[in-house]
Amino acid sequence: MPELPEVEVTRLSFAERIAGARIEAVLVGKPLRWPLGCETQQLQGQRVLAVRRRGKYLLLDLSEGLLLMHLGMSGSVSFGLNLPVTGKHDHFDMVTSLGTLRLHDPRRFGAVVYASGEDDAVAKKLLGRLGVEPLSDAFDALVFHQWLKGRKTAIKPLLLAGQAVVGVGNIYASEALFLAGIRPTTKASLISKPRAARLHRAIQDVLTNAVAKGGSTLRDFSNADGEAGHFQLDAMVYDRAGLPCRVCAAPIKSIRQGQRSSFYCATCQKP
């Protein structure tokens, strides 16, 4: 599933090129997770003012309203002047004066939704409960620690839930916990203030590094230019069960938490 770094990498790969483009046509294929929410003709003639990101959503600011795009489990975006003929898994094309923006989504858990603004009920429903942005000043270490103190849940699933901080997916939660020296099974309420500060910093460092490396291509992710990510190649623990820890050489362990795999080093990461 594309997480925050993949969505940010996607945004960076086409945001400047589409800014100012006039929408000429919108073509919708098979139904996605949610309906578009407007007639395609309503979008024609509008201009794309900017592309932002909130959590794992791309927000395309239009001259009237905005489009919220989610990549779902397997989605990716392409943008260009000469895209191939629409394929089986291409479900949304927005043809503009500067190129075509296309959503490719084999599993169709993604979506493109129109809202009249961020105060629109549709936008509030999708964005209203998201945690703070981890790469923004709003992600405060002291507030983060206070939030953890009131939770007795294991820290790894808590990070994935996205209520305290948004966009920390499975690979990035595993890597951040390793960097902070905290086991994924540690109860959040038991994490001390200094350890919470280390985890806060680790989350930011891991996500920043992931964006710089183009995200992670675990299956089929690519940015709007078709380029794969490389963060996964340097992972310290993720998907390395049984392999030696890159720091201490102890074998990396793997456990199931909920329906997700967690990877950790029992030597470097303490309960």
Curated annotation (Swiss-Prot):
The active site is at residues 2-3, 56, 260. It comes from the Bacteria. GO terms for biological process: base-excision repair. DNA binds at residues 89, 107, 151. It catalyses: Hydrolysis of DNA containing ring-opened 7-methylguanine residues, releasing 2,6-diamino-4-hydroxy-5-(N-methyl)formamidopyrimidine; 2'-deoxyribonucleotide-(2'-deoxyribose 5'-phosphate)-2'-deoxyribonucleotide-DNA = a 3'-end 2'-deoxyribonucleotide-(2,3-dehydro-2,3-deoxyribose 5'-phosphate)-DNA + a 5'-end 5'-phospho-2'-deoxyribonucleoside-DNA + H(+). GO terms for molecular function: 8-oxo-7,8-dihydroguanine DNA N-glycosylase activity; class I DNA-(apurinic or apyrimidinic site) endonuclease activity; damaged DNA binding; zinc ion binding. Gene3D superfamilies: 1.10.8.50, MutM-like, N-terminal. CDD domains: EcFpg-like_N. Its cofactor is Zn(2+). Pfam families: Fapy_DNA_glyco, H2TH, zf-FPG_IleRS. The keyword Cytoplasm does not apply. Binds 1 zinc ion per subunit. Belongs to the FPG family. Involved in base excision repair of DNA damaged by oxidation or by mutagenic agents. Acts as a DNA glycosylase that recognizes and removes damaged bases. Has a preference for oxidized purines, such as 7,8-dihydro-8-oxoguanine (8-oxoG). Has AP (apurinic/apyrimidinic) lyase activity and introduces nicks in the DNA strand. Cleaves the DNA backbone by beta-delta elimination to generate a single-strand break at the site of the removed base with both 3'- and 5'-phosphates. This is Formamidopyrimidine-DNA glycosylase. It comes from Polaromonas naphthalenivorans (strain CJ2).
